[in-house]
C-alpha cells in the first residue's frame, strides 16, 4: 500500500514538483523506519485520526489504498498532494515523538511516558494523540492524562482492543474540533467520563480480584508504581514525583509480603495454608520496596519484615508497619491518614489491603462516581479534601 500511495502521489503531482515529493517521501519512510513503526499501521491510524469512517465497517490494512483512491479529494491528494504529504510527514514526526514520550514540541510528557509503560506494543491511543496534536501544550498534556486513565480502565477491565479502535476513531472528529481548554474539557466529559462511568463497577471488581497471574508483569509494576506515586504526590506535592521512573527503576523490586519462597514455619503459620499460592499473588500482598531492603527482609515472616518496611522511603510500603507523622495536620499526615497499618499478616489482612488499594485506585486513575477513603469499608460518601490535598 505504501508503494501504491507513492505512485498515486506522483500521478497527482506536477513533474516540476517531483524533487520535493521524492524528498518528503524519503523523509516519511526514514522517520517511520527510525522509530521501528510499521508504515501500514501508521497510515491506518492516520486515516482514523483525521477522517470520519463507517463505524460498522472497520478499516483494514488491505483497504488503505482503496480508501485513498476513493477519498483522494477529501484527503487532499487530488488538489494539494504535497500539502497532504507534508501533513503525513508531520504526523510521522509526532508519532516518533509519542514513542519517545515527547509531545509535538519534543518536550518530555510524563503521561506519555506512563502510556508507554502501560501499553506495551499497543498503539490504539495514537489515534487520539494524532487527532489532538494541534492542542496547546498544557491542554495536550491534560488530554494525555485523560487517555492514560481511560486506556488503563480498558486494560484492567479486559476490554477488547477493537473497542479501543472503534471508540477512538469515532471520537477523533470531536477532538479535532477542540481548540481550547473549555472545548477539551467538554470533549473529555462527553466521551471519556461518560464511558468510564459505565465501566466503574467493572473497574472496582477488577481491582478487588487483581492478582499477578491476571495481568502482564510490566503492567503490575505500573499499577504498583502509580499507587505508590500517588501517596508521595499527596504527601510532598513535589514535582520530583511527577515521573514514574523512580518507582520502576531496577533498584526497586516488587516485594511479596507473604514470601514467595517461604520457610516451612512461615507457610505452616499462614491461616489458609492450602490457599497460600492464591494469596501470594494477590495485589494486596504486593508492594514496592528498595532492592537494598528487599534482600534483607526476603523470605521471613511478617514480624521480621516490619523493620525493613519502616526503612522504605515509599509511604505506601512504610504504612504497612507505621504511619509516619510530622507535626500536626501536615500534608504528609493527611496523605497517610487513610492508609491501614497491619500488626499481623494473614488472609484477612491481605484481603483488607486489597480493598484499601482498590479504593485508592479510584483516586489514582480519577474514576467518576462515588468515592470512599482507602480505609473506609462503609458505603458512605466522602468529601474530596484528601483527594485534592488542600490545606
Language-model regions, residue ranges each:
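Secondary-structure transition/capping motifs at alpha-helix termini
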Residues: 135-139, 157, 242-245, 296, ...
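Betabetaalpha-Me/HNH-type nuclease active-site subdomain
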Residues: 185-323, 350-353, 358, 365
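Acidic, carboxylate-rich catalytic segments that either coordinate divalent cations
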Residues: 332-390
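A cross-family structural signal marking well-folded subdomains
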Residues: 2-228, 324-327, 344-345, 376-390
Amino acid at each position: 500500500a505504501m508503494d501504491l500511495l507513492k505512485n498515486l502521489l506522483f500521478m497527482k503531482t506536477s513533474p516540476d514538483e517531483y524533487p520535493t515529493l521524492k524528498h518528503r517521501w524519503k523523509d516519511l519512510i526514514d522517520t517511520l523506519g527510525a522509530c521501528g513503526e510499521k508504515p501500514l499501521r501508521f497510515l491506518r491510524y492516520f486515516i482514523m485520526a483525521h477522517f470520519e469512517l463507517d463505524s460498522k465497517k472497520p478499516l483494514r490494512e488491505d483497504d488503505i489504498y482503496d480508501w485513498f483512491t476513493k477519498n483522494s479529494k477529501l484527503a487532499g491528494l487530488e488538489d494539494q498532494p504535497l500539502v497532504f504529504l507534508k501533513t503525513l510527514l508531520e504526523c510521522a514526526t509526532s508519532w516518533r515523538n509519542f514513542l519517545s514520550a515527547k509531545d509535538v514540541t519534543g518536550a518530555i510528557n510524563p503521561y506519555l511516558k506512563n502510556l508507554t509503560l502501560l501499553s506495551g506494543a499497543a498503539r490504539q491511543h495514537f489515534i487520539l494523540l494524532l487527532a489532538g496534536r494541534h492542542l496547546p501544550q498544557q491542554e495536550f498534556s491534560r488530554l494525555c492524562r485523560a487517555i492514560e486513565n481511560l486506556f488503563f480502565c480498558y486494560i484492567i477491565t479486559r476490554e477488547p482492543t477493537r473497542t479501543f479502535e472503534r471508540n477512538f476513531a469515532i471520537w477523533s472528529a470531536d477532538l479535532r474540533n477542540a481548540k481550547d481548554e473549555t472545548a477539551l474539557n467538554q470533549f473529555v466529559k462527553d466521551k471519556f467520563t461518560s464511558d468510564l462511568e459505565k465501566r466503574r463497577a467493572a473497574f472496582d471488581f477488577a481491582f478487588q480480584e487483581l492478582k499477578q497471574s491476571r495481568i502482564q508483569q510490566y503492567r503490575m509494576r505500573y499499577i504498583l508504581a502509580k499507587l505508590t506515586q500517588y501517596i508521595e504526590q499527596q504527601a510532598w506535592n513535589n514535582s520530583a514525583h511527577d515521573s514514574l521512573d523512580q518507582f520502576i527503576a531496577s533498584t526497586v523490586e516488587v516485594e511479596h509480603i507473604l514470601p514467595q519462597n517461604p520457610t516451612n514455619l512461615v507457610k505452616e503459620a499462614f491461616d489458609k495454608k492450602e490457599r497460600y499460592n492464591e494469596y501470594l499473588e494477590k495485589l494486596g500482598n504486593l508492594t514496592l520496596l528498595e532492592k537494598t531492603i528487599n534482600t534483607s527482609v526476603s523470605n521471613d515472616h511478617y514480624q521480621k519484615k516490619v523493620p525493613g518496611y519502616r526503612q522504605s522511603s515509599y509511604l505506601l510500603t512504610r504504612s504497612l508497619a507505621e504511619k509516619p507523622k510530622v507535626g500536626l495536620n501536615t500534608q504528609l499526615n493527611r496523605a497517610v491518614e487513610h492508609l491501614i497499618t497491619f500488626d499481623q499478616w494473614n488472609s484477612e489482612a491481605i484481603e483488607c489491603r486489597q480493598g484499601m488499594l482498590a479504593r485508592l485506585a479510584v483516586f489514582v486513575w480519577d474514576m467518576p462516581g462515588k468515592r470512599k477513603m482507602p480505609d473506609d469499608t462503609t458505603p458512605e460518601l466522602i468529601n474530596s479534601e484528601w483527594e485534592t490535598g488542600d490545606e
